[in-house]
């Protein structure tokens, strides 16, 4: 009798699971990605059973102006990430939105709203704001993880981030970690992106502010992967489907892009799609080898021209790996001498003001300072990790003289960056924040200290 009770209980459990799987459900989201003056992108992922998706939205100040936009994606696939564009919005306006699945509102435990950017140019001072940034988010999945101590740490850091008011969030690479079972097929790559984006603890953060992202090796493919990765096209498509940047590379290549907020321009670079293998010779006949690429010629031309075009107070170049650290023996643009020297020479020759590098990857945080004769110093702000294993600096890096004193953080953290001040007196402040919201380090730079003597 006891055996039959167990059998019946097991059968009922299986039936419940099957019914749940057959029911149209929201897998993750919704959240507002790229939000502009008159446009916003709403992202979500739904189960294969969902037949239709729509977004209903209205301005908080006037609910009678309710509108509905239908999703045009083909649904019913194994994975169904969707993006819905909301156009014709008013600037500096807060909107409430809800996701509609098969004509029924999807239930969420968090607020779903966004505020369009303000049209401040030629009208008022550049708005003060803050944003969040960081890298290396690892969620454990024991059946596929390496044996031993779990690599993923305390994911409550994402709740702390959700509780930190900010205008937007920049994911600086390794936003999810593909395993051996993932990066050998396109399906596996999509599985990892879908699974890691669906974690409950992420949802409120994603919905609380617009999201922007670059990638690094682990969300691109295998460890240290670059131009030779056989699934790089599939990986690019998956990255496009699970992020909401304004654009993705040029001519169907790469994922680099750009966006602006207030008087700051962000250059989202791609350090994977065009990147040569690290083992490739860095020099030939005593000269840096042009054949060893980091950004690649096309992206480098875009970056240079975008920097020349920019009138922003601060110009933040976001890279998955460090750019400036002379003591980084692992993955760093410095190890790609031709492009590294070319970029630094370009910045100097054109006397471009306000340049800062932001990077991830290292599993610790720090700020590297590189002096330049006759010009302002360059800084590389590294913020890592969110939840991946913490790395302790060793050997000569432990006493890195290029590191700004007081900026080394060797525990889980994220960055809260504030831009404030009067015109011509703007200040950018970086705070390294711990799991519980504690301050682990800080640094600031003034606009005037990143100026060149441009005529």
Regions found by a protein language model. Name each.
Residues 21-455:
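Metal-dependent phosphoester/phosphodiester hydrolase catalytic core
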Residues 1-24, 455:
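Bacterial Sec-dependent N-terminal signal peptides
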């Amino acid at each position: 009798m006891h055996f039959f009770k167990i059998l019946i209980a097991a059968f009922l459990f299986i039936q419940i699971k099957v019914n749940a799987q057959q029911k149209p459900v929201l897998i993750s989201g919704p959240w507002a990605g790229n939000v502009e003056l008159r446009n916003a992108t709403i992202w979500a992922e739904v189960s294969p059973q969902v037949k239709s998706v729509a977004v209903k939205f209205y301005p908080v100040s006037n609910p009678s102006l309710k509108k509905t936009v239908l999703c045009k994606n083909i649904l019913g696939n194994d994975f169904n990430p969707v993006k819905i564009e909301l156009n014709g919005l008013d600037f500096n306006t807060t909107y409430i939105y809800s996701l509609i699945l098969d004509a029924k509102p999807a239930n969420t435990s968090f607020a779903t709203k966004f505020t369009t950017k303000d049209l401040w140019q030629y009208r008022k001072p550049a708005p003060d704001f803050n944003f969040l940034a960081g890298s290396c988010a690892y969620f454990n999945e024991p059946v596929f993880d390496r044996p031993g101590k779990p690599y993923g740490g305390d994911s409550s850091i994402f709740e702390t981030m959700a509780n930190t008011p900010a205008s937007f969030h920049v994911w600086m690479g390794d936003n999810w970690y593909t395993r051996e079972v993932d990066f050998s097929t396109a399906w596996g790559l999509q599985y990892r992106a879908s699974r890691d984006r669906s974690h409950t603890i992420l949802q409120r953060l994603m919905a609380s502010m617009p999201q922007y992202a670059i990638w690094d090796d682990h969300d691109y493919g295998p460890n240290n992967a670059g131009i030779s990765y056989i699934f790089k096209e599939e990986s690019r498509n998956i990255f496009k489907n699970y992020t909401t940047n304004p654009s993705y590379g040029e001519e169907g290549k790469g994922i680099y892009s750009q966006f602006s907020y207030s008087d700051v321009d962000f250059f989202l670079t791609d350090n994977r799609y065009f990147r040569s293998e690290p083992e490739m010779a860095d020099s030939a006949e005593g000269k840096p080898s042009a054949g060893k690429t980091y950004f690649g010629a096309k992206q480098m031309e875009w970056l240079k021209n975008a920097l020349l075009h920019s009138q922003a107070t601060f110009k933040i170049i976001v890279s998955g790996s460090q750019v400036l650290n002379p003591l980084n023996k692992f993955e760093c643009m410095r190890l790609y001498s031709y492009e590294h020297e070319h970029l630094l020479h370009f910045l100097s020759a054109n006397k471009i003001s306000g340049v800062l590098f932001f990077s991830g990857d290292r599993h610790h945080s720090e700020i590297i300072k590189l002096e330049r004769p006759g010009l302002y110093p360059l800084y590389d702000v590294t913020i890592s990790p969110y939840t991946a294993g913490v790395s302790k600096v060793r050997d000569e890096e432990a006493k890195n003289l290029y590191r700004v004193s007081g900026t080394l953080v060797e525990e889980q953290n994220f960055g809260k960056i504030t831009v404030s001040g009067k015109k011509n007196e703007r200040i950018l402040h970086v705070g390294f924040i711990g799991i519980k919201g504690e301050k682990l380090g800080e640094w600031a730079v003034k606009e005037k200290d990143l100026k060149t003597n441009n005529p």
